């Protein structure tokens, strides 16, 4: 599994000009899936995502995770499925998607990942799997990390 994590002051996702998910300060996470992903890799990513220290403490050091930074203040999480994250870009000028999970598998994995996050953190805002989405965000920092399991 691949996650592109972005610390934001605002994030939203729309389909057909209708906002389907929106957050204030927190994380926008683009999620890509590969054929070898399993429940175990999703659990590892959920743990990593929720405990990754990307928010500043009182000394302005990135030392706080999502729950610590917003304890009781409503830190938000927006998960967006993104098929293209797992593309093979090593050869040529056109990406190949043989390294991406099939649409059916990726859809199931995304739903399972959302369920894991809901269990461990609470319900996230989400994009719509398979839809043409417009994602807007205000990156804070910018702080962006590529996470893999």
From Swiss-Prot:
Short sequence motif Gly-cisPro motif, important for rejection of L-amino acids: positions: 141-142
GO biological process terms, semicolon-separated: D-amino acid catabolic process
Domain of life: Bacteria
Enzyme's top EC category: hydrolase
Reaction equation(s) it catalyzes: glycyl-tRNA(Ala) + H2O = tRNA(Ala) + glycine + H(+); a D-aminoacyl-tRNA + H2O = a tRNA + a D-alpha-amino acid + H(+)
UniProt keywords, alphabetically: Cytoplasm, Hydrolase, RNA-binding, tRNA-binding
Gene3D superfamilies: D-tyrosyl-tRNA(Tyr) deacylase
MF annotations from Gene Ontology: D-tyrosyl-tRNA(Tyr) deacylase activity; Gly-tRNA(Ala) deacylase activity; Ser(Gly)-tRNA(Ala) hydrolase activity; tRNA binding
Listed GO CC annotations: cytoplasm
HAMAP family for the chain: Deacylase_Dtd
NCBIfam families cross-referenced by the UniProt entry: D-aminoacyl-tRNA deacylase (TIGR00256)
Subunit annotation: Homodimer.
Family to which this protein belongs: Belongs to the DTD family.
Protein name: D-aminoacyl-tRNA deacylase
